[in-house]
Amino acid sequence: MIKTTRKSKREKEKEINFFEAFIKLQKHFFKDIKERLKRVKDPRHKSYIEYGSDVILFSVLMKNACGIYSMSNMIEQFNKDECIENIARVLGCELEELPHYDTINNFLCSLNPEEIEKIRDYMIRELFRKRSLESFRLLNKHWCIAVDATGLFSFSERHCEHCLKKEYKNKETGEIEKTVYYHKVLEAKMVVGDMVFSIATEFIENEDENVSKQDCEINAFKRLAAKLRKKYPRLPVGILGDSLYACEPVFEICSSNNWEYLIRFKEGRIKSVAREFNNIKGLEGKKTGDSTWINDIFYNQRVVILIET
Ligand SMILES: [Zn+2]
């Protein structure tokens, strides 16, 4: 095995012309993408539009494809005649300058996220249509989709009416010492070899400030699953999740959608299953290497398989 250090990775990346590589891929897989970038529902007032949505979104796509993390860094790196000409040539338009990052940020802030989702969906459908993802099916059947939530940002004061809220209390007095307002997103990521890409997204957020029960990851999963099912009704899905997902609502959604699931198990999450496994693993457990598994564990009228590694 060749160990890749970060430095050698960076050196190697320098040799790649990401722009050309992206254009090659785009021509082969996503012929229609330029049109789609142009057709997004532009939230801006027509009289203020200096750069088309295609120029802005394409610049951002290139930023990400080139592994540039900040907008200001992008402008610094892209604002060269050659680069501007390349982008203009690809999009078939006249360009003297690239949009300022404030212009890009303002546009992205006002754009409905669904407009970006439509472009992502188009790209994923093209990959399925061209059968480019066939070799990544588990047991030649299911595509693994990992679900997990991640924090987006947090604030010490309320930032909007949809914020989730967490109060930290003093253990002795019970007084609230600190309140944190935060936003989270639940992502469904398709696993393709050693890469993953986002296939569906659901924000975890409250409807308003006065909700009696806050939104949570499992509720967001219910919405995410409905979205995924609507977008790809016949996709053979295998859900991968951490131990939080080992619960009846998730099992129920998966069975009714004909999805398989592979979920990490923690003893505390479903005690009856843990008890049964521990009671019979010495007698009926099958072993291979360091792993022991039991095929038929009954839980809420369903049968689960538990593997201990
Ligand atoms: Zn907020």
Language model: regions and residue ranges:
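An anionic, glycine-rich sequence signature occurring as long contiguous blocks
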Residues: 266-309
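Short, structured patches in soluble enzyme cores that scaffold and shape functional sites
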Residues: 149, 190-192, 203-205, 243, ...
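Charged, often Cys/His-bearing segments associated with DNA-binding zinc-finger transcription factors
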Residues: 1-34
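Gly/serine-rich nucleotide phosphate-binding loop at the start of the catalytic core
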Residues: 23, 27-99, 105
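Active-site-proximal, Lys/Arg-enriched surface segment
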Residues: 105-195
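Short, conserved catalytic/metal-binding motifs centered on acidic residues
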Residues: 59, 74-75, 100, 104, ...
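Electropositive, glycine- and tryptophan-enriched low-complexity nucleic-acid-binding patches
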Residues: 169-235
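Domain-level cores of phosphate- or acyl-group-handling catalytic modules
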Residues: 211-273
